[in-house]
């Protein structure tokens, strides 16, 4: 086997000590500046405690679709919010930077809507034409998990509870 000489890329989320964080929280990860000066920020929206809980795929999928609209309405420069494979939260990407407090407040408002007001009509893109796995949605599960997350309180700090 040939010897590898190039360094392997460092994946930030694999460097995080998942035993030290206290979910739910919003964590600022990093900012990247593009060749034309454009700034993109990455945030960890951790909804459940790593290695203790995972949101079932149907509920996480429904939260994903719903907050795609709700966070876009609340966070200027919203680009994307994609679920972690471990099903404990999401990566949020934005143009520019936002405080973790502002992001946590937007997330809290979005989860409050899901938990207490959302109907099936509020969940976008749930058809075969608009979703790559349209059968794997559960508004009931999304609502129950949103309530659990809100009961815990969303912190603007991953290591110290600073609930917004």
Swiss-Prot record:
Binding partners and assembly: Homodimer.
Keyword match Phosphoprotein: no
One Pfam short name: LuxS
Protein's organism: Bifidobacterium longum (strain NCC 2705)
Gene name in the database record: luxS
One Gene Ontology term of the molecular function aspect: S-ribosylhomocysteine lyase activity
The organism's place on the tree of life at top rank: Bacteria
Reaction(s) this enzyme catalyzes, per UniProt: S-(5-deoxy-D-ribos-5-yl)-L-homocysteine = (S)-4,5-dihydroxypentane-2,3-dione + L-homocysteine
UniProt similarity note: Belongs to the LuxS family.
Enzyme category, top tier: lyase
Protein function: Involved in the synthesis of autoinducer 2 (AI-2) which is secreted by bacteria and is used to communicate both the cell density and the metabolic potential of the environment. The regulation of gene expression in response to changes in cell density is called quorum sensing. Catalyzes the transformation of S-ribosylhomocysteine (RHC) to homocysteine (HC) and 4,5-dihydroxy-2,3-pentadione (DPD).
Name of the molecule in the record: S-ribosylhomocysteine lyase
InterPro entries (alphabetical): LuxS_sf, Metalloenz_LuxS/M16, S-ribosylhomocysteinase
GO biological process: quorum sensing
Protein EC: 4.4.1.21
Cofactor: Fe cation
UniProt keyword annotations, A-Z: Autoinducer synthesis, Iron, Lyase, Metal-binding, Quorum sensing
Residues annotated to bind Fe cation: 61, 65, 131
Cofactor binding: number and manner: Binds 1 Fe cation per subunit.
């Amino acid at each position: 086997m040939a010897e590898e000489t190039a360094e392997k890329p460092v994946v930030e989320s694999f460097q995080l000590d998942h035993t030290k964080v206290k979910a739910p929280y919003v964590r600022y990860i990093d900012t990247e500046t593009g060749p034309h000066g454009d700034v993109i920020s990455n945030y960890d929206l951790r909804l459940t405690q790593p290695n203790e809980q995972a949101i079932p795929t149907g509920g996480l999928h429904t939260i994903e679709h719903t907050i795609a609209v709700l966070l876009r309405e609340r966070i200027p420069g919203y680009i994307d919010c994609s679920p972690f494979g471990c099903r404990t939260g999401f990566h949020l990407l934005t143009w520019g930077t936002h405080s973790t407090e502002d992001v946590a407040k937007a997330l809290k408002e979005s989860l409050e809507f899901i938990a207490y007001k959302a109907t099936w009509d509020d969940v976008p893109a749930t058809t075969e034409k608009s979703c790559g796995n349209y059968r794997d949605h559960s508004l009931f599960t999304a609502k129950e998990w949103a309530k659990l997350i809100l009961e815990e309180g969303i912190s603007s700090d991953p290591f110290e509870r600073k609930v917004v």
